[in-house]
Amino acid sequence: RGKIRIGVVTGDDILDRLDELLAAGHELRNMDTNEPLATIRDRVLSANAYIGSTPIVQALQQGANVVVTGRSTDTALTMAPLRHEFGWAEDDWNALAAGIVAGHILECGAQCSGGNCLH
């Protein structure tokens, strides 16, 4: 029996970098209100960036059986094992498109069939 190897992907927590990003001229505006982050910076308690499939693929390539991540894109959770198992290159756009569709269906499929209804 083999041991379970757990991979960990970090890097999504960017709270400590917010001031650096603002000082570098990145306004980081609210996508709904267009309000710049600087106007509410003192109240921000959490800031996370989405991680794509590449670091998850790298963890799998290093022998992980299970990968624990911070905030990743919804489709990355499907895309990473597909890329790893089938050896898809980062620029194999047709294969990646199929993986994105599969990931999106798995992530949102239940909602499309009524799984997100209150009644």
Report residues per predicted region:
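An acidic, phosphate/nucleotide-engaging active-site surface
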Residues: 14-69
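Charge-patterned, long linear interaction tracts outside catalytic cores
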Residues: 56-91
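Catalytic or ion-translocation cores adjacent to nucleophile or general acid/base/metal-coordination motifs
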Residues: 2-14, 78-119
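Short, contiguous, pocket-lining structural segments
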Residues: 48, 73, 93-97
